[in-house]
Regions:
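Structured C-terminal helix/loop/strand segments within mature extracytoplasmic catalytic/sensor domains
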Residues: 6, 25-37, 70, 134-137, ...
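Active-site SXXK
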Residues: 70-94, 120, 243
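Mid-domain, small-residue-enriched loop/turn segments at the edges of structured enzyme/sensor domains
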Residues: 109, 113-117, 129-184
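N-terminal secretory signal peptides and thylakoid transit peptides that target proteins
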Residues: 1-14
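Short, well-structured active-site flanking segments
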Residues: 87-103, 189-193
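Short helix- or helix-capping micro-motifs
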Residues: 116-124
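A short, well-structured edge-of-sheet supersecondary motif
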Residues: 28-65, 231-234, 245
Length: 272
């Protein structure tokens, strides 16, 4: 294990990624690849992909600029929101606690029903997670966002809006760091909460590989998507790769392309 501040400083010295303050992680080597950047060019958009190949202690990135740019996390914040809900007791059981539909018909049909935590994260039900955030409250939310060292830790802009339109920002490297700590079960919260969140993350099978990931789509709740995220990790045999991808969503096809381009990048680096 090496200090994350030192590791990211080395990456910056190598003109790959910017320095920032982190705790401990095993990153030791890094590279960026034009073939990954070309995946976004081929979609007529701009974006970034960062992969951490755990067994190789290798970070692979598509670029040295956007990979360090902090943006609103959108629904990728459902990962820490779920952890905090479980830690605070707002949710006791992700399969039994029911969040009743508020009766407001929204453009995404899957949101217009009752949900458990598991079903809500599966369809990325923003209203459910807004209610969860309100029940957690500003003080407890700030405490845990600080404890988890999540992004810039700024939850200004409204307790049910800060990850959608407010002040919270996180960059792809920070996403990889956070997700990797969840994957390893070393976040400063209970093992139970981490196990449950790992279990409820949406799963995609690609051949003999498994991808556990959460998407994000900035503006989805108002019908005006602009930025897409996908963060998580891929498992193939004993090999694991943690990743974060974001891209500008300039047309409807880019929404579905979030998973497609991520799979392409994971294939390019030999992760799946």
């Amino acid at each position: 294990m090496i200090n994350r501040r030192h590791a990211l400083g080395l990456l910056a010295a190598g003109s790959l990624l910017p320095p920032r303050s982190f705790a401990n992680v095993s990153y030791q080597r890094s590279e960026f690849r034009d073939d990954l950047a070309k995946r976004f060019f081929d979609l007529a958009t701009v974006g970034t992909f960062v992969g951490y190949k755990v067994d190789d202690y290798l970070i692979v990135a598509s670029d040295k600029v956007r990979s360090g740019e902090a943006k609103l996390p959108a629904s990728t914040f459902k990962i820490p929101n779920s952890l905090i809900a479980l830690e605070t007791g707002v949710v006791a059981d992700p399969d039994k606690d029911i969040f009743k539909w508020d009766g407001v018909t929204r453009s995404i049909d899957a949101w217009n029903k009752d949900h458990t935590l598991r079903s809500a994260i599966a369809v990325s039900a923003v209203p459910v997670y807004q209610e969860i955030a309100r029940r957690i409250g500003q003080e407890r939310m700030q405490k845990y966002v600080d404890l988890l060292e999540y992004g810039n830790r700024d939850i200004g802009g409204g307790i049910d809006q800060f990850w959608l339109t407010g002040n919270l920002r996180i960059d792809p490297i920070q996403q990889v760091d956070f997700v990797d700590r969840l994957r390893r079960g070393v976040l400063p919260v209970s093992k139970r909460s981490q196990e449950l969140v790992r279990d409820i993350l949406p799963v995609t099978k690609v051949g003999d590989a498994t991808i556990r990931a959460k998407s994000g789509l900035l503006g989805a709740e108002i019908g005006n998507p602009s930025l897409g995220w996908l963060v998580g990790w891929a498992e193939k045999g004993d090999q694991q790769t943690v990743f974060a991808m974001n891209m500008d969503c300039k047309e409807p096809g880019h929404i579905a392309a979030r998973m497609t381009v991520t799979q392409q990048c994971l294939t390019d680096i030999g992760a799946i």
